[in-house]
């Protein structure tokens, strides 16, 4: 199959997910990834908005305009502030990602690292602002475990250093660390 979605077994996909991904793909010449907005699933309840979702949606605002989908500068600025793209909401376009593979050097930020690498390529990051799925937030997740053990800080700092000088990366990481509180169930 030319399109691959990294679905998690405990996430829920809405009926519009496939429609929205295919509609966005039709607007592209060379799509790299296609992704939708998402909601959270906490304790069996759908959460459509909270502080973290608001920040992520704000970061992704430029990508509501198709003219920015192929703009590497815009994509990289979005990623330089944090991981606003929800991994299970992403569909990869395999034929446009030759020689790409996820690296196995992190526990939590594997996806952010992947988007950073892909953001350097020519092509589009196609985004639809309609929620296409629900991402389950739970205490047993790798992200929650790493936050509890403070293991995620090193990974976040590593990622910020891909975009910023060390001292700026440290400042952003301190602010970013506060957002981790929203991963608590």
Model-predicted segments: where are they?
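Short aromatic/hydrophobic "clamp" motif used to bind/position activated sugar donors
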Residues: 4
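The conserved acidic donor/metal-binding loop of glycosyltransferases
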Residues: 8-12, 37
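Alpha-helical elements of Rossmann-like donor-binding domains used by nucleotide-donor carbohydrate transfer enzymes
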Residues: 12, 16, 20-23, 113-117, ...
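Conserved protein kinase catalytic core
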Residues: 14, 43, 142-144
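Conserved donor NDP-sugar-binding/catalytic core segment of glycosyltransferases
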Residues: 16-55
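Conserved nucleotide-sugar donor-binding catalytic segment
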Residues: 60-152
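C-terminal, non-catalytic tails of nucleotide-sugar-dependent glycosyltransferases
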Residues: 61-69, 73, 124, 148-185
């Amino acid at each position: 199959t030319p399109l691959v979605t990294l679905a998690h077994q405990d996430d829920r996909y809405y009926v519009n997910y496939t429609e929205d991904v295919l509609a966005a793909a039709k607007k592209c010449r060379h799509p790299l990834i296609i992704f939708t907005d998402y909601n959270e699933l906490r304790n069996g309840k759908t959460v459509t908005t909270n502080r973290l979702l608001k920040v992520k949606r704000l970061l992704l605002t430029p990508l509501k305009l198709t003219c920015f989908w192929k703009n590497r500068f815009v994509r990289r600025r979005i990623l330089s502030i944090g991981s606003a793209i929800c991994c299970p909401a992403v569909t990869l376009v395999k034929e446009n990602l030759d020689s790409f593979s996820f690296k196995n050097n992190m526990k939590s930020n594997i996806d952010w690292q992947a988007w950073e690498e892909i953001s350097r390529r020519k092509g589009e990051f196609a985004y639809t602002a309609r929620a296409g799925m629900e991402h389950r937030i739970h205490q047993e997740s790798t992200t929650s475990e790493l936050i509890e053990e403070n293991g995620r800080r090193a990974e976040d700092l590593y990622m910020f250093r891909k975009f910023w000088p060390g001292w700026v990366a440290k400042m952003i990481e301190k602010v970013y660390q506060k957002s981790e509180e929203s991963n608590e169930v």
